[in-house]
Amino acid sequence: VMAKGAEDRAFYRYLRLASLCEVGGAPGQWSLSTDALHRHQVDVQQHAPLAMLAGTTHDTKRSEGVRARSLALAEVADDWAAAVRSWFDGHGELIEGVDAATVLLALQTAATAWPIDADRLTDYLVKSAREADLHTSWLDVDGAYESALARLATALTDELSGDPADELSGHPTADGSDGDGARAIRDIVDRTRRPGWALSLASLAIRLTSPGVADLYQGTVAFTYSLVDPDNRIEPDWEQRRALVETAARLDGPTSWEHDDVDASKAVVITRTLALRQRRPAAFGGSAGYVPLEISGIHADRALAFARTAHDRPVVVTIAAIRAVGAHNWEATTIALPEGTWRDRLADDEQAIAGGADVPLATWLDRFPVAVLERLDE
């Protein structure tokens, strides 16, 4: 009932922020406070320390990379709404016969799974429409409606992949408008791409160091932008993944991030954090502890920090930026770092930091969206 009534029906109809409509998700809950998240983490450690923490699976409607870019999109909600209105105004003829919710889904999907080609977007929109069972369905296919979805997908991907100096699509929009809406959509795609990567890396590091057992779906050592089955079952390029892990062994997080080698950034977070877990099993098992850490200052609401303890002593600290769009004054935002001597294992040139004091988050987050610290004085 849950799968067919909610996840495979209602979740394809409620599309204000499509990434909330995930398997096991609660679309009505837009966010959690950091305090609520900390309480949840403590509860998991106490009652389900071996629970699986999945990011992407064979059945997710959007991979973790797509969802992170959707969260970045939500950070610029007003600009996104204006861009969508402009796009609707300029594409009346193109979207004739397609309901507004599905058009909104197409725009969100193109923006958060970009780059995506017309065939993939068409397949996704058709599957989504059939699951929604409003205008077409698996048992009663409406060929005209699905053809309209294909035209929409083709026009949208052409616009987003075209030359910005040539009205994006190389020609006026379907009703002769000047393409301002398409330009606005593309601008937001460009603005939220890197913040989306940052949020994905932050989410990954949190998952790898939280109570529970983190699961890494096949091929997700690199950024993937897969959609619902069967898109998320495509065989990964294993040679490329092996080469990526080898590259990550020669780089650290800040270096890969500075050079926009974001796949290497993700591989660095995975390989180094898993190595830390192997060195510090007592900090992650059933007898480990979880301690929220206080963040203070001008952007305290934009970061999250916690410690994992072994034998009641903090030995691992995770610090992550949880909002990524716009400027951040990390120098004026501090963490109450526990006693001890600490080093960020995601950065090779990081100097040891003394705890027992408030330390500016700029120490780490000015260079990389996340830090995973290990205690040295043991």
Where are these regions (language model features)?
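Carbohydrate-interacting/catalytic domains
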Residues: 1-378
